[in-house]
Amino acid sequence: MKKLLLLFISALLAVSVQAQSNDKPGNWKLIVSDEYPADDVGVATYTVTTDFNADPTGVQDSRNAFQTALDKLGENRRGGTLFVPAGRYRISGKLYIPSGVTMRGEWKRPVKGQSIEGTILMVDSQGGNETESNSFITMEPSTALTYLSIWYPHQDPENIKPYPPTVLYGRDGVWGNEYCNVRHVTLVNSYSGIILSRSNGGGCPNIYDVYGTPLSRGIEIDNIADVGRFEWIHF
């Protein structure tokens, strides 16, 4: 009987190990760059270009590649980091970052009169309204957006059009929405930059080392349940 039990347990372990190996992420790698130094060292679970064929030239729409990668990391609340190497990525549509997931690029602090460098997400939308449900990036609880820039190529500062928020803290229908983080990010010509959801807010929002040229409002925090942290905001 003991031998049969041991054989049964061994078989279960073998199945479990096999299942994990079939579902393991891509090539884990340290995110280290002399050209784009960071305050910390990240570990990439997936790389959006090599693992999901996103186009870093900005010619092809990369929205599906990004969302597929983010959803993969969010499966079973596994979490992880999606690394977005330096380049320009055209995004025609909305992105959702699931709980426990970080989207991380390569970034330099902007310098007046110089071009933005590093990872640039290009919002390929004509705008026209400011509806929260159409936010460019919506973040669920315990997520992070770090080391990248977001640019609105169709926005004209001389003829400003309303756009939905660039980053929305709090996804409708998801309870909580605590601990959303934006760190080391540049917002180029956002109409509304970082907004805590007016309909489904949360607590403990974090914003650190953010630069930008918002055209209506940079950060809007209301309907908050717990204290947040906001440091080094440069608008």
Regions from the PLM with identified roles:
Residues 1-85, 90-158, 163, 181-183, ...:
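Extracellular "leader-to-stem" segments immediately downstream of a signal peptide or signal-anchor
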Residues 66, 116-137, 147, 157-174, ...:
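Extracellular beta-strand/beta-solenoid scaffold signature
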